[in-house]
Amino acid sequence: MDVDYQLAFNLAPVGLCLSRNRAIVACNQQLCEMFGASRELLIGQSFQVLYPSADEYERLGARMAPILNARGHYADDRIMKRANGEVFWCHVTGRALNRAAPHEAGIWAFEDLSAQRP
């Protein structure tokens, strides 16, 4: 069976993105819909645009790095921000492609928890 990984990425039921140095280099349609932004708007942007504040972006980045170093993956529930400014609870899980440099490159999944955690 041939697997079309690009199609699977694009049609996944959760938001997916690939990152380099905490910037979005690829994302699927579900991520765009979740955050209310187009792919063109998100590609090349720092993850900071998805956080409620720059401080929260920095705080979580510092908290994740040692965990990604040790385990290679990270997950939590956190408040994120849509393009229209609305904040919402989101389950985020990701994997560093290089544990020695955890923010260098990664794959991340985002699940909107609004229905469970308004």
Residue ranges of each PLM-predicted region?
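PAS-family sensory/regulatory domains
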Residues: 41-54
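PAS-family sensory domains
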Residues: 25-27, 33, 51
